[in-house]
Amino acid sequence: MNEEQRKSTSIDILAERDKKTKDYSKYFEHVYQPPSLKEARKRGKEEVNYNDDFQIDEKYRNMGQGKTFLIKTYGCQMNAHDTEVMAGILGALGYTPTEDINHADVILINTCAIRENAENKVFSEIGNLKHLKKEKPETVIGVCGCMSQEESVVNKILKSYQNVDMIFGTHNIHRLPEILEEAYLSKAMVVEVWSKEGDVIENLPKVREGNIKAWVNIMYGCDKFCTYCIVPFTRGKERSRRPEDIIDEVRDLARQGYKEITLLGQNVNAYGKDIDGLAYGLGDLLEDISKIDIPRVRFTTSHPWDFTDRMIEVIANGGNIVPHVHLPVQSGNNAVLKIMGRKYTRESYLDLVNRIKTHIPNVALTTDIIVGYPNETDEQFEETLTLYDEVEFEHAYTYIYSQRDGTPAAKMNDNVPLDVKKDRLQQLNKKVACYSERAMQQYEGQTVQVLCEGVSKKDDTVLSGYTSKNKLVNFKAPKSMIGKIVNVYIDEAKQFSLNGTFISVNDKTVVTQ
């Protein structure tokens, strides 16, 4: 779908701003369709175009002159990357960043819809801004990100949070200048939410957070439709960037001196599958990027279904592709996996793990797990625990199932009592802590290479950073070491971190092309 087609199907509250009625929520309910699994599955047939000509119109260039902005970001790395893009656009409009919310002229809340707790935090944040809006009515408050793509969320804001000036979604960040202008001119709340994704927009300005590590989007959206997940609806179908655009961005980051990049996508393993006539996947992209002078390259998030032997081969070759694989399993029971729509079985997952470990003996495996899924029995949960023992994950992100409106799982009977869910989470977390501590202990007495990222959050006399396998290391050293890869001798292994002694700067170079 190209930009013109996209605009013709967008939700246009802007055109209604001059109407006398103020019942925008009713209007929105009529034109906005809630997530439809049936319709969403058809979307792969629509064409995706690439826009290389993004420019900010000159008439917007001084819009933010003398004004400040603040963006509060919730959620995943993709949201963090979107925040960098929005900061880049606002900077190009003349706005300057501030960390003081009371002095910000524009406040954007970049939201996450993955769990109910994240949404509750956002609504609390919006509510807290009501007092600020009364004191400074000229402040523009905007809500964006994944929550903005949900009908129920937008209607709630329209009805209960009149301090919000504008709402926009994940598909039209590049239209921020136009949306901002409308917010300044309109007396009503501005809502521009695209229910379908648009073109892949290149050349968007970015203000990256720091100059050590960088996010690099390689694709957008997800077509897996796990039954618990809202992301395929809030982020749209899978759209891969062209390899040459990604490689050019990585080369530019190398020239700027970045030490680590993370290739981003809701399902990075599916990279390239949506581009007709391109026999080029994530393994090929990793191999090409391995020839660029970036010391470390990571990728996230992986779906086991699309994890290929080609990827394993490239990671096994070493170089700058780190030996850390985050491979969400979600459950160890086949019946639960089937209800989740995960497309693999316990056996196929373990077979993949075995292939990874065979070819990459030094790999660090981590995962995501959900407990208390609808109809999950004690016996089924026990299979998750035994799978954890079999794989020996070095860490896991664990969650109690959170119902998301609009997903197939939301229609299921959530019949696992909350106290049972909490007990299962506690059991699982004990196992996570046990295996994490075991993984950490093998580093005692060893020298590791640490990318020093800054001072410790707990002690500003201590520096901290991560190993290639994503282990947190704390050590004392001159602050001039920040941004460098250094050698650290590990004196003490803790449950989730390592303490060490600084030895030297690691001046090992990466082979370049």
Swiss-Prot record:
Gene3D superfamilies: Methylthiotransferase, N-terminal domain (3.40.50.12160), tm_1862 like domain (3.80.30.20). InterPro entries: Elp3/MiaA/NifB-like_rSAM, Methylthiotransferase, Methylthiotransferase_CS, Methylthiotransferase_N, Methylthiotransferase_N_sf, MiaB_methiolase, rSAM, rSAM_horseshoe. Keywords: 4Fe-4S, Cytoplasm, Iron, Iron-sulfur, Metal-binding, S-adenosyl-L-methionine, Transferase, tRNA processing. Binds 2 [4Fe-4S] clusters. One cluster is coordinated with 3 cysteines and an exchangeable S-adenosyl-L-methionine. Signal peptide: none annotated. It is found in: Cytoplasm. [4Fe-4S] cluster 1 binds at C76, C112, C146. [4Fe-4S] cluster 2 binds at C222, C226, C229. Its cofactor is [4Fe-4S] cluster. Residues 208-438 form the Radical SAM core domain. It is an enzyme of class 2 (transferase). It catalyses: N(6)-dimethylallyladenosine(37) in tRNA + (sulfur carrier)-SH + AH2 + 2 S-adenosyl-L-methionine = 2-methylsulfanyl-N(6)-dimethylallyladenosine(37) in tRNA + (sulfur carrier)-H + 5'-deoxyadenosine + L-methionine + A + S-adenosyl-L-homocysteine + 2 H(+). Residues 441-504 form the TRAM domain. SUPFAM superfamilies: Radical SAM enzymes (SSF102114). One of its GO terms (cellular component) is cytosol. Pfam families: Radical_SAM, TRAM, UPF0004. Residues 67-185 form the MTTase N-terminal domain. GO terms for molecular function: 4 iron, 4 sulfur cluster binding; metal ion binding; N6-isopentenyladenosine methylthiotransferase activity. It comes from the Bacteria. Its EC number is 2.8.4.3. Monomer. Belongs to the methylthiotransferase family. MiaB subfamily. Catalyzes the methylthiolation of N6-(dimethylallyl)adenosine (i(6)A), leading to the formation of 2-methylthio-N6-(dimethylallyl)adenosine (ms(2)i(6)A) at position 37 in tRNAs that read codons beginning with uridine. This is tRNA-2-methylthio-N(6)-dimethylallyladenosine synthase. The gene is miaB.
